[in-house]
Amino acid sequence: MINIFLDVSRLLSRLSDGLLPTGVDRVGLAYIQRYGTHARAVLSERGISVVLTERNSRQAFELLSQSIRDRGAIRKIVARACVDSLSNHYFERGVLLHTSHNGMEHSRYYRSMKGRNIRTVFMVHDLIPLTHPEYCRPGVDGAHRQRIYTALRHADGLITNSQATLDSLGMEANRAGLPLPPNVVARLAPAITSRTSVSAPLDAPYFVMLGTIEPRKNHWFMLHIWRRLVERFGASAPKLVIVGRRGWECENVVDMLERCASLGDAVIEESDCSDERLRAWLQHARALLFPSFVEGYGMPLAEALALGVPVLASDLGVFREVAGDIPDYLDPLDGLGWFDQIHAYAQEQCPARDEQLRRIKRFSEPTWDEHFGHVDRFLETLR
């Protein structure tokens, strides 16, 4: 039997700070739900790691699974981990599953796990800082390159969320002259699991953009489209609902949101949105808008289609991998195309939208059972 170890450092830190789970965090929580009953928790900082006892692991997993923000309990877990850790223990068939990028740049992390007979398997979500550094904060490309290269050199296995991510990883490994470790592609399931119908949050046609406000998501472009819609159609223009926190390098978007008078009544910003409210926004949207320049996976795409909601998206390879020909695709800089499609989709009678609704019926929703089926079979191959 394989002994599973889960690094929960990022999850506990964010829970202690009262932060809502990100997409990466939700993956980590899914791994706890899958393996938590028999796994051990790991805490790490700058490559120094401790393995928690079974009792401390259960407590950590319970706090995370139930989103219990008990900072005192979290501090006790960390303190006990330093005293009661199994740092020098040797495990039979141990495998560390690390679902975030945090800490994968430290080679001593891999060495310490190897010293415990624990193989290291990391999930790679994207290589965007390397392939498109212009969309990231300064310096992120160097940090991410160190993470990826260290994993290529030392990891026993890698999990990617899409074939597109694996292809990018393979090209980067080839460019660096590094071998690609054993790997598996395992698609991620939508975070929204309930399909219960809820009442519409807005009595008007609207569209949703979902994701952190950052340059590669193309919010600035879409706000200009909306300004044109308002100029053309006035009060009858559809609404735009932006669900996501303000991120980095987005001052031009913030200027539009806060200072463009014509957008005041047409754009709604939801920076802290619960799963229930997000489901309501998506269920009744005319479409999800996904005009990104680049994505590693694109979870909102899968979430919208799983709810039966049409999608207007950039024509990205990873989107076609996840959704095939179901969405209506556009170039992320085709202003006239986006304007026309949004105006058409806003109408009560829209043949293009009706046709997509028919295509959605054949969408194959990724599930966690499928994901972990791929992962479990992969782990059995690691010797």
Regions inferred by a protein language model and the residue ranges of each:
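Carbohydrate transferase catalytic cores enriched for Leloir-type hexosyltransferases
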Residues: 1-383
